[in-house]
Amino acid sequence: MKPMEHIKVVELSTYLAAPTAARVLAEWGADCIKIESPQGDPARTQGAVFNMPYSDEENLAFDVANFNKRFVTLNLKSETGLEVACKLLAGADVFVTSVRTKSLKKMGLDYETLKERFPRLVFAQVLGYGEQGPEKDSAGFDVTCYMARGGVFGTTVNRGDAPMIPTNGFGDFQVSLALAGGVASALFNRTRTGLGDKVTVSLHHAAVFALSTGIISAQYGNPYPKSRREVVNPFNNVYHTSDDKWVVICCPEYDRDFNKIMRLIGREDLVDSPELSNCAQVNARGKTWKVVDVLDEAFGRMTRREAMSLFKGADLPCESANEPLDIYEDEQCWANDILCRYPYPQGGRNFATNPVRFSSLGTPDYFSGGKQGSATEEVMAALGYTREQVDAAVAQGAVEGSKNLKRL
């Protein structure tokens, strides 16, 4: 039995963060119905932004956040469309949304209203900036709330360089897991209290939490961003190899590993160096750049493969700074089902599975829900609507059935 089997999820959200949380719940066995407006989730056409195909036959940019769902199209500005949504919620265990609170209130779909009507419902919401403060109603995406306001851009950049250009949704996918975990906890607590709960995760908060080490240490004089030539520990740094690749070494016990690493790279002359072998003294003298220079020279003589083989052979953590094309070829990913290949008509395509593993579940089966509105009639029939009522709702523009994706 899957962990979320018999749990019913209704989703009203767009783009990546909240939809992916619902996808994760669906992978765990939940029956997930996604509500879209007549305009559809904008993510359906985001493939154009990523140089990917987007069609009714192949739309991985949309599917990556929407596998294993059924899709209904409701005009929530209409009486009938809103009625259908509320009937869905009446039978649901979880409501997942990324709609801003002020908009939910206009529709009567905010937490306070739904709590009164459906006290067992778990209300799960992705927010940009949280529930309080001057930005609580502001628009935002992961690149603004998470990467920028949350400090990721300003912390992870090499000091003096422009902020990095991240993959889209970098913060969204992390938030999705946090929300799914919160939902699971709320459902467990409901077995004890009989009541649902409100679960929120903001992109802004998630980023600040992810930067916890920087947040706690900056106040003690460990400022960010840093230069790679001025790191506190040169053995926790990135180095450029002779084949124009980057590798990362992570050896937090500098004093213990200094002699071992110097011997490893052929610098026996620096073993027990009074100037460089003690991390505290190196930092006090402002000489970390000297150790970085030594390592730069050593790594500059090695290819990426040679560097990794040398350090891993000495049981010292060292990894390639991989790019997506490297990840496709990583046997470790395939051995652990980190990657999965979805069989589209034109060929299989790779995507990342969610990292939470259940020994009883294994790798989930994935299916694409297909066209927008593809389950509208089926879902309405299950709610008790007659064929005539469904047709009338379609004619009124309150609901829509299956329709082809329009290209931009």
Model-derived features: positions:
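Oxidoreductase and adenylate-handling cofactor-binding alpha/beta cores
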Residues: 149, 176-196, 213-219, 262-270
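Glycine-rich beta-alpha junction loops
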Residues: 39, 129-130, 203-208, 243, ...
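Active-site-adjacent elements of ketosynthase-type condensing enzymes
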Residues: 209-229
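N-terminal helix-loop segment corresponding to the beta1-alpha1 unit
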Residues: 1-192, 305, 371, 377-408
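Aromatic-enriched alpha-helical interface/lid elements that frame and gate functional surfaces
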Residues: 235-314, 318
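Flexible, small-/acidic-enriched active-site or ligand-binding loops
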Residues: 344-392
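A glycine-rich dinucleotide-binding beta-alpha-beta segment and adjacent secondary-structure elements
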Residues: 313-365
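Conserved Rossmann-fold dehydrogenase catalytic segment
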Residues: 131, 160-170, 191-207, 225-231, ...
